[in-house]
Amino acid sequence: MDSLAESRWPPGLAVMKTIDDLLRCGICFEYFNIAMIIPQCSHNYCSLCIRKFLSYKTQCPTCCVTVTEPDLKNNRILDELVKSLNFARNHLLQFALESPAKSPASSSSKNLAVKVYTPVASRQSLKQGSRLMDNFLIREMSGSTSELLIKENKSKFSPQKEASPAAKTKETRSVEEIAPDPSEAKRPEPPSTSTLKQVTKVDCPVCGVNIPESHINKHLDSCLSREEKKESLRSSVHKRKPLPKTVYNLLSDRDLKKKLKEHGLSIQGNKQQLIKRHQEFVHMYNAQCDALHPKSAAEIVREIENIEKTRMRLEASKLNESVMVFTKDQTEKEIDEIHSKYRKKHKSEFQLLVDQARKGYKKIAGMSQKTVTITKEDESTEKLSSVCMGQEDNMTSVTNHFSQSKLDSPEELEPDREEDSSSCIDIQEVLSSSESDSCNSSSSDIIRDLLEEEEAWEASHKNDLQDTEISPRQNRRTRAAESAEIEPRNKRNRN
C-alpha cells in the first residue's frame, strides 16, 4: 500500500486527486487492500481494517448501520482499479512533465481569434448565397423586362456608349458561370456523417444479452473466460475457511498457549499479550481468506513477529530518550556530562515542576495560616474558661476558710470582721486584677499567686489561733451565736 505522500498529483493532473481519494480506505486512508463492501450501505473498506473495527463496534464506521463480519462481501473491481492506477501513475506523471505548459495568454488569444473570424466566414457565405439567388432570378426574367432594364441602363449611363461588345459578352459569361444549374439544385443532398447509423444487435449465445454485431466476438471471448474465472474463484473460496471467534475470558492460560502453539505463534508474555497476539493473527488470517491469493499461516506468523519486534524497538527508543543509562566503564566526567545534558534537555520540565510546587506551597501556606489563627482563638477561649472556673473554686475555698477561722476565734470576731472584710476586698481586687491580666498570664501563675497569699494570711493569724484555745462546748455556742448574727446580715445584704 502506498503512503499518503505518494498521492500528490501535479497541478496539470489535479483532476486525478478525486479518483485517488475515492480509491482509499476510510479507516487507514491507504489504497484499498482486499476491498470489502457492506451490502446494507455500499461502503467499502480494507478487509483487515473493517474486521478490526467490527471487533470493537458492530456497525459501519461511516453511517453506523449494524454490520457483522459474515455480511461483508468482496469488491474485486476496486482492487483492480487500484492496481491499474498504480500502474498508470508513472506514465501520467511522465506525460505531465513532458508536455509543455500552456500559457493563459496564448489560450486567450486563440479564443479571441475564433470569436473574430467565425462571424466573417458566415457573412461571406451568406453574401455568396444572396448573389447566386439574384443571378438565378435575373436569368429567368422575361424578355420584356430585360429590354426595359437595358433601355433604362442606356439612358442612365449614356456616356459609356464607347464600351465594346466584347466586354458585354464577358459579363454574361461570368454570370452564367457563377449561377448554379437548376438541375443540380433539384438533386437531393447526400446524408451528413453526423447522423447515426442504425446499429444491429445480436443476442449472446452464452449469457443472452443483446450485444452490437461488431462487438459480439469480443464479448463471447470475455464471456467464456468469465465462466472459467468463476469456477476457479469458487474452488479457491472453498479451500480456506476463516477462523471462528474465541471467548478469551473463558480460556485458561494453558488452553490459550495451546491455541497459539497450533498456529506456530510465540507463547512468551503475560495473558494480555498472548490474547493480543492471537487476536491479531485471527484478524490477519480471516482478512487473507478474502483475497484471491491468500497468504499462508506461516507468512502471517512472520509478519506478526516483525510487527512485535518493531513495536519493542520503538518502545525501547522512547525509554532511552527519557532515561539516563550508565555503564561500569564510564568515568566521572562522562557521567557528569550525561547529567548536564539531561538537565539542559529537561530544563523546561523542571521549571514547570518548580512553578507548580511553588503555587501549591503558597496555597498550603495560606490554608495553614488560617488554621493556626483558628486554633489560637480556640486555645485562648479554653484558657479563659479554665481560669474563670479556677477563680470561682478559689473564691469558694477562701470564703470557707475565712468562715471557719472566725468561728474558731469568737472572742475576736468583732474586731476581726473589719480585717476580714478588708482582706476579702484585697482578695477580690487581686482576683479582679488577675481577671484583667488573664489574657497575658497563664492559669498556673494565677493559682500560684492565690496560694501564696493564702499562706501569708495563715501565717499572720497563726499566733491568734494558738492563743485562743476554746473547749468544744464554747465552740458550739459561739458557732450558734455567730450563725444567728450572720443570718440577718446576709438578709440585709440581700435586701
From Swiss-Prot:
One Pfam family of this chain: SAP
Where can the Glycyl lysine isopeptide (Lys-Gly) (interchain with G-Cter in SUMO2) cross-link be found? 376
Query: Residue ranges of the UBZ4-type zinc fingers?
Result: 201-228
GO CC terms on record?
centrosome; cytoplasm; nuclear body; nuclear inclusion body; nucleoplasm; nucleus; Rad6-Rad18 complex; replication fork
PTM-bearing positions, type Phosphoserine: 99, 103, 122, 125, 142, 158, 164, 322, 471, 483
InterPro entries for this protein: Rad18, Rad18_UBZ4, SAP_dom, SAP_dom_sf, Znf_RING, Znf_RING/FYVE/PHD, Znf_RING_CS
**Where in this protein does the record say N-acetylmethionine is found?**
1
- Report RING-type zinc finger ranges: 25-64
- Report the principal subcellular site: nucleus
Sequence positions bearing Phosphothreonine: 118
Alphabetized GO MF terms: damaged DNA binding; identical protein binding; polyubiquitin modification-dependent protein binding; protein-containing complex binding; single-stranded DNA binding; ubiquitin protein ligase activity; ubiquitin protein ligase binding; Y-form DNA binding
Q: Part of which pathway?
A: Protein modification; protein ubiquitination
Q: What EC numbers are recorded for this enzyme? A: 2.3.2.27
What is the main EC category here? Answer: transferase
Q: Which reaction does it catalyse?
A: S-ubiquitinyl-[E2 ubiquitin-conjugating enzyme]-L-cysteine + [acceptor protein]-L-lysine = [E2 ubiquitin-conjugating enzyme]-L-cysteine + N(6)-ubiquitinyl-[acceptor protein]-L-lysine
Q: Which CDD domains does this UniProt record tie to the protein?
A: RING-HC_RAD18
Q: Where is the composition biased (Acidic residues)?
A: 410-421
List where in the cell it is found: Nucleus; Cytoplasm, Cytoskeleton, Microtubule organizing center, Centrosome
Alphabetically ordered keywords of this record: Acetylation, Cytoplasm, Cytoskeleton, DNA damage, DNA repair, DNA-binding, Isopeptide bond, Metal-binding, Nucleus, Phosphoprotein, Transferase, Ubl conjugation, Ubl conjugation pathway, Zinc, Zinc-finger
Binding, Zn(2+): 204, 207, 219, 223
Task: State the PROSITE patterns in the record.
Answer: SAP, ZF_RING_1, ZF_RING_2, ZF_UBZ4
Summary of subunit composition and partner proteins: Homodimer. Interacts with UBE2A and UBE2B, one homodimer binding one molecule of UBE2B. Interacts with SHPRH. Interacts with HLTF. Interacts with SPRTN; leading to enhance chromatin association of RAD18 and RAD18-mediated PCNA ubiquitination and translesion DNA synthesis. Interacts (via C-terminus and phosphorylated form) with SLF1 (via BRCT domains); this interaction is required for efficient repair of UV-induced DNA damage. Interacts with SLF2. Interacts with SMC5; this interaction is increased in a SLF1 or SLF2-dependent manner. Interacts with DNA damage up-regulated protein DDUP.
Entry function: E3 ubiquitin-protein ligase involved in postreplication repair of UV-damaged DNA. Postreplication repair functions in gap-filling of a daughter strand on replication of damaged DNA. Associates to the E2 ubiquitin conjugating enzyme UBE2B to form the UBE2B-RAD18 ubiquitin ligase complex involved in mono-ubiquitination of DNA-associated PCNA on 'Lys-164'. Has ssDNA binding activity.
Q: Write down what this protein is called.
A: E3 ubiquitin-protein ligase RAD18
**UniProt source species:** Homo sapiens (Human)
